[in-house]
Swiss-Prot record:
Cofactor: [4Fe-4S] cluster
Alphabetized HAMAP family for the sequence: PSI_PsaC (MF_01303)
UniProt-recorded name of the protein: Photosystem I iron-sulfur center
InterPro entries xrefs: 4Fe4S_Fe-S-bd, 4Fe4S_Fe_S_CS, PSI_iron-sulfur_center, PSI_PsaC
Signal sequence bounds: none
Predominant place of localization: plastid
Role: Apoprotein for the two 4Fe-4S centers FA and FB of photosystem I (PSI); essential for photochemical activity. FB is the terminal electron acceptor of PSI, donating electrons to ferredoxin. The C-terminus interacts with PsaA/B/D and helps assemble the protein into the PSI complex. Required for binding of PsaD and PsaE to PSI. PSI is a plastocyanin-ferredoxin oxidoreductase, converting photonic excitation into a charge separation, which transfers an electron from the donor P700 chlorophyll pair to the spectroscopically characterized acceptors A0, A1, FX, FA and FB in turn.
Binding site for [4Fe-4S] cluster 2: 21, 48, 51, 54
Length: 81
């Protein structure tokens, strides 16, 4: 089951999340909305393994990239509420 990867407009274009992703889910794309003129994009969410390394690597106070685990993965990890 694929996970949902969301990129928020608080992204500063630092590339930390892209470099941290072991499955190359993320890439940088041109965007005029930040100083770096690029923003992270998640075109291959079907390859996301849910490790959340991208979240850990994000230096912004409000995480600019978030991984939302699929329900099946959440249950198997014992995280369901």
């Amino acid at each position: 089951m694929a996970h949902s990867v969301k990129i928020y407009d608080t992204c500063i274009g630092c590339t930390q999340c892209v470099r941290a992703c072991p499955t190359d889910v993320l890439e940088m794309v041109p965007w005029d909305g930040c100083r770096a003129n690029q923003i992270a994009s998640a075109p291959r969410t079907e390859d996301c393994v849910g490790c959340k390394r991208c979240e850990s690597a994000c230096p912004t106070d409000f995480l600019s990239v978030r991984v939302y685990l699929g329900a099946e993965t959440t249950r198997s990890m014992g995280l369901a509420y």
